[in-house]
């Protein structure tokens, strides 16, 4: 199993698992460390069985016969043994290792009796982050501050308020505050808040397919932590993007184009940022945020490089005390380093133990937070750079990208065009709309250096072929090369048809397979409005009346009577700001009554017919379920 075919998320999990077994931190797993792992996990296994499993793992994993398992060999063990009894026991042992709490699974997805594990370290880190983020929010006083050493977090998310607030901190204005139920909560109003949180999380690109409101109400730890990590990460990564932070151009390497830099994921940009500063400090580069930072030395030098030097008005210098580097003990050294980070206001996400164990998820968050506060980069002057190429993504592009990510495509889509250039994500979307993909025809990464693009082009040709012949899409004038080269107009034409089909499929499933088109949706909307004695109606998805959002709001009130507070709305002679105000309320209310709406308020104000169609289709789905 090559590293290239393992997703970033999975690589993170594997590094975490590896770090738990590799107790001496030398980068290898020995036979003794495997024995210790099974002892520490207290699994009900006889001694001879532990010996057998250990020998089996060493025999399978130690490919170069050097008496120890490297990280690359460890990846192969995990993938090669996925279904065997040995692997199951091995995974169970890792999950039960210190700092990991194992709990019985009870959700519909997991039959009772299976084990779901969650990380105490993550819980501790997230609680401290949320406490700080919401410490001054009057709506959260009933739960903040939470105690990181108890299960406060899992109870605190149960009413949906904290989740809604954290989503808005990560992507401001996602949720209209007027739609959050805050006072005298009942089981029904709590359910509404949780609908609002889950559907809004989905709209910002969180994968929430297996999470229900009930899971959050019950505070299921592994689901709560999984959702919170996605929300927090989206917020941390928001500005690690060239169009939003032009100073990142300072990270361009010799012979590299702006386009190359724009293709990097936030994780890759963070690694490059750290190495840029380490290089300036004359230090060794790092290749990851786990094993390479365990001794805290890279962190020390990074802090020294980014700390304010006193050369900017109003920002006093902070001189990093490097004496802790001389500490012999790793934990002690990490603690001294974190005390210096605290002087910068950046002691977040990691404890000294998390650093020494190389917890990849929490160290990534620590670095991202440090970058956001002290990037210490300067936009290069006089460089021959096409600043015009730096335009950010359009709202429509962002909506498509968030939709894909919310469905759990792998790898995650950070840049719509470059991340679709091998069509792997497109194939996954075909499967979501019930178009069968012959995976034997698909080339998978890692692609060879020579001829790699040809492999991607073959994928793109197959993707266009599937669209034309299986999905029956209208793809006139679109060739595989257009997807491969990231032609905006033609890529969007395919992506829109994928999203449209996905939306209509949901309606057809609810309606027992009955075919649905635009006219059927418009007729349903008007009939529903009329039956509820509402005065509004729409002629099509281009109807100018939609810019007031009143037809949408009336439809929501028709589906769930009494849900809309009309006192909050302006209904006549609206200016642009009032239209936007209505639209924000409408989109959040649609999500609150249970419609998974991806469109943005601006789509209603500008009457973007594509996105307007998805709003009405999602509401129709909700309305049909009610019948």
UniProtKB/Swiss-Prot annotation:
Q: Which residues carry this modification: N-acetylalanine?
A: 2
Do you know which InterPro entries this protein is assigned to? Answer: Actinin_actin-bd_CS (IPR001589), CH_dom (IPR001715), CH_dom_sf (IPR036872), EF-hand-dom_pair (IPR011992), EF_Hand_1_Ca_BS (IPR018247), EF_hand_dom (IPR002048), Fimbrin/Plastin (IPR039959)
Q: Which domain of life is it from?
A: Eukaryota
Phosphothreonine: residues bearing it = 291, 353
Name the GO terms of the biological process aspect: actin filament bundle assembly; animal organ regeneration; cell migration; extracellular matrix disassembly; positive regulation of podosome assembly; protein kinase A signaling; regulation of intracellular protein transport; response to wounding
Region annotation Actin-binding 1: where it falls in the sequence: 106-379
Annotated positions of the N6-acetyllysine modification: 76, 88, 294, 297, 361, 472, 542, 579
Stretches the record annotates as Actin-binding 2: 380-624
Q: What is its main location?
A: cytoplasm
Q: List the disulfide bonds.
A: none
Post-translation changes: Phosphorylated on a serine residue in response to costimulation through TCR/CD3 and CD2 or CD28. Serine phosphorylation promotes association with the actin cytoskeleton and targeting to peripheral cell projections.
Q: Return the GO cellular component terms, semicolon-separated.
A: actin cytoskeleton; actin filament; cytoplasm; cytosol; filopodium; focal adhesion; glial cell projection; perinuclear region of cytoplasm
Q: Where does Ca(2+) 2 bind?
A: 62, 64, 66, 68, 73
The free-text function statement in the UniProt record for this protein reads: Actin-binding protein. Plays a role in the activation of T-cells in response to costimulation through TCR/CD3 and CD2 or CD28. Modulates the cell surface expression of IL2RA/CD25 and CD69.
Q: Extract the PANTHER family matched here.
A: FIMBRIN/PLASTIN, PLASTIN-2
Provide the protein name.
Answer: Plastin-2
Quick one: which gene encodes this? Lcp1
